Amino acid sequence: MGKIIRISGPVVVAEDVEDAKMYDVVKVGEMGLIGEIIKIEGNRSTIQVYEDTAGIRPDEKVENTRRPLSVELGPGILKSIYDGIQRPLDVIKITSGDFIARGLNPPALDRQKKWEFVPAVKKGETVFPGQILGTVQETSLITHRIMVPEGISGKVTMIADGEHRVEDVIATVSGNGKSYDIQMMTTWPVRKARRVQRKLPPEIPLVTGQRVIDALFPVAKGGTAAVPGPFGSGKCVSGDTPVLLDAGERRIGDLFMEAIQDQKNAVEIGQNEEIVRLHDPLRIYSMVGSEIVESVSHAIYHGKSNAIVTVRTENGREVRVTPVHKLFVKIGNSVIERPASEVNEGDEIACASVSENGDSQTVTTTLVLTFDRVVSKEMHSGVFDVYDLMVPDYGYNFIGGNGLIVLHNTVIQHQLAKWSDANIVVYIGCGERGNEMTEILTTFPELKDPNTGQPLMDRTVLIANTSNMPVAAREASIYTGITIAEYYRDMGYDVALMADSTSRWAEALREISGRLEEMPGEEGYPAYLGRRVSEFYERSGRARLVSPDERYGSITVIGAVSPPGGDISEPVSQNTLRVTRVFWALDAALANRRHFPSINWLNSYSLYTEDLRSWYDKNVSSEWSALRERAMEILQRESELQEVAQLVGYDAMPEKEKSILDVARIIREDFLQQSAFDEIDAYCSLKKQYLMLKAIMEIDTYQNKALDSGATMDNLASLAVREKLSRMKIVPEAQVESYYNDLVEEIHKEYGNFIGEKNAEASL
């Protein structure tokens, strides 16, 4: 048995560890802390410890388990919440309370729970590695397939059915003169990639339902994508804006000052912005559908803005907001979101009014949704403090302003997990702040799978490894997550793995490397950073699996990077971009303009576009690629023309260039912009995306023809068909085709009036 001779944070040096091998798991000290051998010199072993080493002393024992760091694989993984080394956090909470006691190592899978095993083979059949022996209904959404472990083949001499625990023997296989007992549970070393028969080219897209991703920057099943980390959630209202709480009205600026002084709250500070995560949520009111309901806010945002818009209404209501902040405007029978700078006199905006009803004994006061007409709008320039409340679970709005106006708030989350057509989602919170992980752990279990109505957790595994946990466990969490993903891929499922954030993992590598006194590379990161990042992303892919039957599965890896100050030239971002083929560039400026998803179409890219072209042409339309290229061309041209417009002014520009700016605005606002909280707009099928894009390009074509015939953009900008196009995003899937046909007919008719009778007839 070895003994400790040196301790440096999470790094421990021991000597005379019995039978020491690289990456063996050891138990360190009297408390039996879990560690892993990462370096051997003579009789000295260097160990990275996955738990806090405070209080450990030299000469304490080190015991070698003689096995590598492994995960348990079997029924019960789904719906679980693990830490970085697959310890179930719900079990630990029962044992040690809110904090993880050191030395605890409960089993990852419940040993007592019984699962209904349904055999898929019979006694006497010959089986091979990867073959499915039987199935277990793990959750309402996922059937768990029990496979023959690697290295085992032969005749089935016993196969069980009925209810069994994960450690029970459910089959016996005889081959090569040996008899093998097979349990429902198996283990696998996390650093070793699971074998596949062959990798396949990325030819099928991971459909997310998000138009900016599916249409412009698609990711393939089995592909890799990089996303920069979180940023400011956007600016909203001035500090003197009243917010309606359950205890009455309070100025949002006062609420922020009280919150930032409360030591129980967590404060995050960025450049010209602060977010206070509230220990005690604010009880407020929000608009959900056509009702005003009680809601809660878990955070307050403070930032700066160089302009404020004051909006006043007929009945004396008033609010001061940033120009890009959206108000809810009534158009016909529907309510749409419109930036305050674009709200006009005469528009009716959503408000709340107090309704009292009852008899002389009891009076019940309720809030009801109403609309008030705008009578004036003023723009003020200068530097203003602005604030926002985060209300993620109640339509992202709150009631405030002088006179109870519905105020918008939007932060998009969980869309890929909720809407992508992956069967399994593995989310790794690697080194994120505890409050952020808490928000995910509390909101994820409440989300519903939109296709089945079942809880999203029924197909999800969460791995939580917060920033105050030992840094060594961050690296382990990445490997734990990808190994679990590979296991479900081997069953034939499509898995989406989200690692948030790989930058925190790289920081852990840097700290361990520093403790080992290794030669630092760029910015202090170890020289092998690029290799480690590549090893992780290389475990993604779509593959023909090891099995006698033809079975396919995929792992799509989406890694978030959190570069300091948003500088993607730093080593972690550059090494990530080198091995990933999709980059979704999140843009704080777009978020501030309330454009969500805030993926910048000029800075983002996808290298899968050509690989997926034939799939889109075959399964959606042969015009798909041409429409996409034209949309990208218009958006690129818009960025060039905006500089010209700023120099010479919009009115001095040629009509054709005005048209490009106009169509680009339609693409941005009516196609790329998408509401995560609108029941219809949250998910957009590929067919609907195609018809929306085609309708926009139809306007582009006919607008150019009308301009050639002498029309001006002033004539065309007020056509009624343009408003009908902007409403297409909220048309239900079942009605979208007939809506599109009517829309195109109206485009031909209204623009035909400007083209001239001859041209109109020719084009029709």
From Swiss-Prot:
HAMAP family: ATP_synth_A_arch. It comes from Thermoplasma acidophilum (strain ATCC 25905 / DSM 1728 / JCM 9062 / NBRC 15155 / AMRC-C165). It comes from the Archaea. InterPro entries: ATP-synt_VA_C, ATP-synth_a_Xtn, ATP_synth_asu-like_sf, ATPase_a/bsu_AS, ATPase_F1/V1/A1_a/bsu_N, ATPase_F1/V1/A1_a/bsu_N_sf, ATPase_F1/V1/A1_a/bsu_nucl-bd, ATPase_F1/V1_b/a_C. One of its GO terms (biological process) is intein-mediated protein splicing. The intein interrupts the ATP-binding site. It catalyses: ATP + H2O + 4 H(+)(in) = ADP + phosphate + 5 H(+)(out). It is found in: Cell membrane. GO terms for molecular function: ATP binding; proton-transporting ATP synthase activity, rotational mechanism; proton-transporting ATPase activity, rotational mechanism. Component of the A-type ATP synthase that produces ATP from ADP in the presence of a proton gradient across the membrane. The A chain is the catalytic subunit. This is A-type ATP synthase subunit A. Its main location: membrane. The gene is atpA. GO terms for cellular component: plasma membrane. It is a peripheral membrane protein. PROSITE patterns: ATPASE_ALPHA_BETA, INTEIN_C_TER, INTEIN_N_TER. The keyword Transmembrane helix does not apply. Keywords: ATP synthesis, ATP-binding, Autocatalytic cleavage, Cell membrane, Hydrogen ion transport, Ion transport, Membrane, Nucleotide-binding, Protein splicing, Translocase, Transport. It holds the Pfam family ATP-synt_VA_C. Belongs to the ATPase alpha/beta chains family.
